[in-house]
Every structure is written in structure tokens, then in C-alpha cells.
Amino acid sequence: MTESVKNINMIDAVKLFFKNYFNFTGRASRSEYWWFILSYFIVSIVIGTIEFIFTFATVFADIYNDPYSTPNALKYWYLMPSYLFTYAMMIGLLSLAARRLQDRGHTGWWQLANIIPGILFLIPYLSIFDSIVTGGSFNPGAAIAATIFGIIGFGTGVTMIVFLCLPPQEDENKWGRNPLLPDTRMTDQISDELL
């Protein structure tokens, strides 16, 4: 069962995220979801700012120094933290979104409606990018496919945001009890003992 608290703050949301990292069952409240997304966004901005500073310094050094002095593979080492951070958070973000969707009464598999069009957009987009870089011929079919999947992806993205923002189903649903409701297990146990 997912552990959650009624009055959640950013620190509690981060703790719950890591505690429930592999937990795709149960429910996550809106505050649990959005507080963690805010903290994820803040860390991403900090990492991105550091990478921007290093990128600017590297480009500046390349302009005024010998660009061949450092091997290219080592020159951009500072881009690794953002990739590592993104990949390290991926499963946890999927499980958190699944629990948030389940809190609303939707299956966590709804995420595929957002992921699949994104992948299907990326395939023709990379084909177009490759033809531009290599000087190959333009493929109008790839452009049409990228446009169609981009529009579908935008629509499913908006739908996901709406689902993630809507209030939870009250009390219980098939994924468990509303995490914002007070825990009545102790109250029920005490009342049973009094009878």
C-alpha cells in the first residue's frame, strides 16, 4: 500500500517519491504529485544552469584556444549529470504518475497514450533531421507523419495534464483508499475493542 499523509509538503513528497519508487499500485494525492514535480523541476533548472555555464565556457575556450586540445568525448563531460538525473528519475516518475492517475480512477496505463505518440513523432523527426544534416533529400511523408504524431502527442499531453490536475475519487476505488482521508484503522480497532 502506498504511504501518504494528509498535509503533505515538498519534503514529504520527495520522501514518498523515493519510498514508493517502484510502487505502481495504490494512489498518490495531487499534492504528493505536484510537490514532487516542482522539486524535480527546480533540480532540473539548477543542473541545466550549471551545464549552460560549462557549455558557454567550453565554446568560449574553443573560440580563443586550440579546439583540438581536448578530445570531443571528454570536452562535454558536464552534460552527463542531466542525462543521469533524468534516467535515474524515470521509473519513479512513471510510478508516481500511475498512482496519481489511479487516485483519479484511471489506470496507470493511460501514460502510454502520451508516450507512444511521442516515440512515433521522434522516429520521422529524426529521419528529417538526418536528411538535413547529411544533405539528403527531403521526405514529405516523414514530415506529415511527424506532424500527425506531434498533434496527437499534444492532445494526449493536454489530456494527461487535465487528468493529473483533477481532484481524486472520494473514499475508495479499486486502487485503494483516498490518501487524503484520515486513517480510520486505529479508530475501527478501538471501537471493536470497546464492543
Regions picked out by a protein language model, each given a short descriptive name:
Residues M1-Y40, L93-W109, I161-L195:
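Membrane-interface extramembranous regions at the lipid-water interface
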Residues S4-D12, S69-S95, R104, W109-W110, ...:
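Selective recognition of hydrophobic, aromatic-rich stretches within alpha-helical transmembrane segments
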Residues Y40-V43, N114, F129, T187:
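Single-residue recognition of alpha-helix boundary sites
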Residues S44-T86, P117-T156:
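Membrane-helix interface segments in multi-pass membrane proteins
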Residues W109-I119:
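Central hydrophobic cores of alpha-helical transmembrane segments
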